[in-house]
From Swiss-Prot:
One of its GO terms (biological process) is proteolysis. This is Thermolysin. Gene3D superfamilies: 3.10.170.10, 3.10.450.40, 3.10.450.490, Neutral Protease Domain 2. It comes from Geobacillus stearothermophilus (Bacillus stearothermophilus). Its cofactor is Ca(2+); Zn(2+). It catalyses: Preferential cleavage: Xaa-|-Leu > Xaa-|-Phe. Residues 32-235 form a propeptide. The active site is at E378, H466 (proton donor). It is an enzyme of class 3 (hydrolase).
Length: 551
């Protein structure tokens, strides 16, 4: 946890031909109903909504392919859409939409961060979200072929990490596999490797390196500590029971346990289980599955485990009961947490497969699992990783952080646990009354921007992911609670509708490279889907983003 530029930069933790000819049947596309948000870098659409295209007897994905090819000049996209856009996900939702997610490729190679989503209802394409990288077919840099191997790329990344980050060779954890991609930065396109370096010592990190596959140049690097990947979980075979214990703040709560000689913090009632471990002040994870002799967890040493276990369950319940989502991956992944990590450690994070909580040093933090919004914030990073996949850098990273703050707060209200619009207030600076890490109602209170004109444009904090999240946090607060901000009045619509709108935006409209403007369009479209285009909900979303200067 660090203070920089008088701002709290706190990380909790989070780019040939058709095999079969496509026949363009008669269609109607009402151009006058199209609403377009433009990507300023490429001058191409990043969000289009309206009655875009209807072709009788055509599959939803074929509608997308036809629309993109029909508008090739608008997208500056002259490749075969069916060959280039790889369908990764397709499902029907409870509003009657068919939702699809596509990965852009170039000659079969995925383009880093280039994902688009599409919606079809009653045979009509209604929305296309995400930026297609234009003119890749003209890039001579993509025609030479790779010259480096995966191992050579990883060696380059590891050498730089030791020299400039860790100063010693870390003990690497299992990370994501190295991936061969097309990487685009401005007008430059490169064949590249994405190398993931995940480690716990000397300080936890989950670095992503983009290495040029031709000359070995480091094209980009950033720490994405909150990215999630399920890990293997060994469960105890026993009898489900209910224990009782006291949390970090002294409150008593019942917790689900499993009995097999001892009582273990293993909750079998939710998905594939919730497991809480004791790291015993070490940095080896996960540690030992927490065991107790009498199912009574009242010792002070027990308190962080009680809260980590209980609040993971509350967060699971929120996503299931409110959004019909089963765990962070939507498929009931087991949730693992380790407490008593290291000594005096002032942080909490996902290491890529589980939650990790430090005990704090007693001055900056007390045990971080004592904050329900902290727990839900971190688990929401995992939800984001399995849906929008927001890249943890610049505006997409700030959206990533804001989404975690928003749902961390909504879970706190769901649990009715002294809820407020502050982040981390229960565990931060115990000696300072009323202090918190960030404020959603008043980001400027802690030096964070509350308007796009005040955004941070430097390189610290991965391009301001924790700083600029304040802009989106303020918009979310206004959508829920209403108010007047910079002369713009917003009618509040309440927390429940805020949650529904942002959950739909996150899971169906946002893409890895989404910026604030695309988020606005995604939120407006989500409100339109849920409540209708002329509703107060849509008006309030527009008002809130106007109030924080996001167009």
């Amino acid at each position: 946890m660090k203070r920089k530029m008088k701002m709290k930069l706190v990380r909790f933790g989070l780019a040939a031909g058709l095999a079969a000819q496509v026949f363009f049947l008669p269609y109607n596309a009402l151009a006058s109903t199209e609403h377009v948000t433009w990507n300023q870098q490429f001058q191409t659409p990043q969000f289009i909504s309206g009655d875009l295209l209807k072709v009788n007897g055509t599959s939803p994905e074929e509608l997308v392919y036809q629309y993109v090819e029909k508008n090739e000049n608008k997208f500056k996209f002259h490749e075969n859409a069916k060959d280039t856009l790889q369908l990764k996900e397709k499902k029907n939702d409870n509003l009657g939409f068919t939702f699809m997610r596509f990965q852009q490729t170039y000659k079969g190679i995925p383009v880093f961060g280039a994902v688009v989503t599409a919606h079809v209802k009653d045979g009509t394409l209604t929305a296309l979200s995400g930026t297609l990288i234009p003119n890749l077919d003209t890039k001579g840099s993509l025609k030479s072929g790779k010259k480096l191997s995966e191992k050579q790329a990883r060696d380059i990344a590891e050498k730089d990490l030791v020299a400039n980050v860790t100063k010693e060779v870390p003990e690497y954890e299992q990370g994501k596999d190295t991936e061969f991609v097309v990487y685009v930065n401005g007008d430059e396109a490169s064949l590249a490797y994405v190398v993931n370096l995940n480690f716990l010592t000397p300080e936890p990190g989950n670095w992503l390196y983009i290495i040029d596959a031709v000359d070995g140049k480091i094209l980009n690097k950033f720490n994405q500590l909150d990215a999630a990947k399920p890990g293997d979980v060994k469960s105890i075979t026993g009898t489900s029971t209910v224990g009782v214990g006291r949390g970090v703040l002294g409150d008593q709560k019942n917790i689900n346990t499993t009995y097999s000689t001892y009582y273990y913090l293993q909750d079998n009632t939710r998905g594939n289980g919730i497991f809480t471990y004791d790291a015993k002040y070490r940095t080896t994870l996960p540690g030992s599955l927490w065991a107790d002799a009498d199912n009574q967890f009242f010792a002070s040493y027990d308190a962080p485990a009680v809260d980590a276990h209980y609040y993971a369950g509350v967060t699971y319940d929120y996503y299931k009961n409110v959004h019909n989502r089963l765990s962070y991956d939507g498929n009931n992944a087991a949730i693992r947490s380790s407490v008593h990590y290291s000594q005096g450690y002032n942080n909490a994070f996902w290491n890529g497969s589980q939650m990790v909580y430090g005990d704090g040093d007693g001055q900056t933090f007390i045990p971080l699992s004592g904050g329900i919004d902290v727990v839900a914030h971190e688990l929401t990073h995992a939800v984001t990783d399995y849906t929008a996949g927001l890249i943890y850098q610049n505006e997409s990273g700030a959206i990533n952080e804001a989404i975690s703050d928003i749902f961390g707060t909504l879970v706190e209200f769901y649990a009715n646990k002294n809820p407020d619009w502050e982040i981390g207030e229960d565990v931060y600076t115990p000696g300072i009354s009323g202090d918190s890490l960030r404020s959603m109602s008043d980001p400027a209170k802690y030096g964070d921007p509350d308007h796009y004109s005040k955004r941070y444009t430097g390189t610290q904090d991965n391009g301001g992911v924790h700083i600029n999240s304040g802009i989106i946090n303020k918009a979310a607060y206004l959508i829920s609670q209403g108010g007047t901000h910079y002369g713009v009045s917003v009618v509040g619509i309440g927390r429940d509708k805020l949650g529904k709108i942002f959950y739909r935006a996150l899971t169906q409209y946002l893409t890895p490279t989404s910026n604030f403007s695309q988020l606005r369009a995604a939120a407006v479209q989500s409100a339109t889907d849920l409540y209708g285009s002329t509703s107060q909900e849509v008006a309030s979303v527009k008002q809130a983003f106007d109030a924080v200067g996001v167009k």
